Amino acid sequence: MTGLISVAGAAVVDSLENPKRLLAARRSAPPQFAGMWEFPGGKLEAGESFEDALHRELLEELGITVRLGSEVEPDAGAAWPLNERAVMRVWFAELLDGEPRPLQDHDELRWVPLGNGDEALTLPWIPADLPIVRALLERVASGLLN
């Protein structure tokens, strides 16, 4: 991943053991992504681990603390491609403290039921996040969260 921007994303769920809902965040900017849904998270700062970046970003963006679970890994490669300059790694995360609020970069948050995967797929996701949503739904349906 040398030379690429590294982004950490969180699939915030209501329970790591038996997830029923996923927290989706609607972008307010930049214009090309405004109104589209994504996994909350952000870029790593110099010397920061993916896990530390996730904890920092979720506190800054949503005002929450979480417990991280397993990573939602792609079928090929170490990270999900976002574009030609950036890649993202995503972890399941369980809300520990705080009430999620759209503090930065988002104008709406929504808990999406996971029991019917089609409902999560009806949101207009940022295109690069859609394959991650599909992989997450497959993992939840098969019970492969650990």
Language model region names:
Residues 1-22, 43, 74:
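Conserved N-terminal beta-strand and adjoining loop/helix that marks the start
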Residues 31-34, 90, 101-146:
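Nudix hydrolase/Nudix homology domain
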